Amino acid sequence: MNTKFIDILFAFLVFSLPFKYIPRAFWQTFLGGPFGQDLVVYPLLIGFIYTAYCQWKYKNVVYKWDVFRKFIFAYLAVLLISLVWGLFNYPYYDQILNGPADQIEKLPRVLALLHGIGIPVAEKALLEIWMFARPVKGVLFEAFYTFGAVYMIFCWYHDRAQRAIDILLKVTTVDLVIAASYGLVDVCYQNGQMWAQNFITLTIPLLHGDVAAKFDYYQFHTHLFWDAQNRSIFLEPSYFGIYMAFAFPLLWWNIFKQTSKWKQAALVVLFTVLSFEIFLTQSRTALAVNCAVLAIFAVLCFYHMQKRLLFLLASLCLGVVISFAGSMEFMRFGQVPSQIGEWTPLATKWQNMQEKSHTNNINKQKEAQSVKEGITVKEQKVQSKAQAAKGTAGVNAQTYIDKNLKSLSGTDKKNAHAGSNHSRFTVQKTHIRIGLEHPLFGVGTTLWQGYLRERLDRDPGGEIQKWNKNIDKRGLLRAGFANLGDFTLRFAETGFLGLGLYLLPSLVLLLAYAKVLVKRHERIAPFLFCSLSFIGIMSTGLGDGMNITFCYWTAMAVSFLLLTANNVKFTLSFHFPKSSEARNDG
């Protein structure tokens, strides 16, 4: 196996992590599994092919195959049993068979092909075959592109873990520079600058597929512009935060490793800029997860009481304070007024506001009418200028926190996220109810949409009703509910057995990290930062899908490499060291 080629491939894989939902011409929906619409599918496909070739030719690639084989066979067995059981008891066949014929995009082409070569097949018969074959393919491909990819990366670097870590840190920093730079363009766009709007108009279709400037009730489209929320290069603002939950600890690790003060200062500035942009995402996912990761880092720093870690923590906290204050000032005085969910381009909106203000100032008829109504010309001009003012009135630290963090509780029905809260909590509660009704194997992988559609038929939530109407219009096999909680969804799909096996590698890693982090020793930094990256990206599964990006699986692979290279034992037992042990390890 050519290690230089592997290094290039792994660097490409790490670089591709932020680029989700690429232009449709580059999709690999048949072979790409859960990442068929993402750039990361290409290094994964190339890696699988090259690894299989090297193993076939040289017989020296796989490592610890017996351990992985036992796990993956057990995992696939549970998922396939769950699927077969779910299909056997599936109560919504009639709804699918009587649904729209185009709910499977490829079905008309397959029918035409079979008829063209003289094989007469009824549409419903082919649909029944498809209903079984499609979820089986989904189970196999997801396992292949997730746990299989983790094992592949582990085989690449099991004897040179430090090289994988160096590539990860360097390439992630490159991605962060790109994200920060594009995020500043987004800031200029939110400031109403037309050049930034034109730049986004040109580049977003190069980064993402199905771009639209107008809202479509039934069909998902990438927003060309994203109102008052900063999304940088990402598909949407929350994905910016999800990626940063993985990348921020790696950036901190890079800062910690630097020996040059100038490089350290430059990376701290990069962190401050990215924090500023994260605050401007106004995304609860982004803020909650990244604040939690920083809080855990602070606790670990005070636990270990190492000067370099405490100095880094102080630098990061200063950067957060500066970025938060800057974001508040920008939203109050520099941002074109906009509402979450608004589709109007902000530079165009600002231009229209200025033109309206100018027209009001020179319109004699309006001045005369204002005087008649008891408003002086001077007062009218003040009102005209206010119409063209930037910033949102009433924005301060308290209102921002109430809107973007406290709103996670879902208790305030008037906040901007109230509908989203209702959808998320309702769907997750329904997942849990479905799982408890089918506790052992769940309802079967990919078969949960019909159960949600039935149980939430009369739910008052506008977003939920939109998904219901979408299913009714396009069919259960083509439309459905968003994944609003990976762990609860997997519980509904695969029961306790499937969820337990899915989480088993993560639990083993978390316990191994805990065993290391609880000991006070000087070389704790690699374990601390890598564990934070893994915990940060894993926590996003509480409210979103784990396969939104490949970050979770990258963090898992690097975690196994780091811990294996340092001879950490992987067991499910754990004990806190005695005080004497802690002192000796220090």
Q: What feature does the model see in each segment?
A:
Residues 36-43, 96-155, 166, 176:
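Aromatic-anchored transmembrane helix interface
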Residues 1-91, 539:
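N-terminal signal-anchor transmembrane segment
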Residues 402-403, 408-409, 413-437, 441-494:
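Long extracytoplasmic/lumenal interhelical loops at the membrane interface
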Residues 88, 181, 186-194, 302-415, ...:
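A membrane-periplasm/extracellular boundary helix in multi-pass inner-membrane enzymes
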Residues 43-49, 290-297, 306-313, 502-512, ...:
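Transmembrane alpha-helices of multi-pass inner-membrane enzymes
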Residues 9-14, 266-275, 481-485, 492-493, ...:
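Loop-to-helix entry and N-terminal half of a specific, functionally important transmembrane alpha helix
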Residues 139-152, 164-228, 232-305, 309-312, ...:
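Alpha-helical transmembrane segments of multi-pass inner-membrane proteins
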Residues 1, 43-59, 246-258, 295, ...:
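Hydrophobic, aromatic-rich transmembrane alpha-helices
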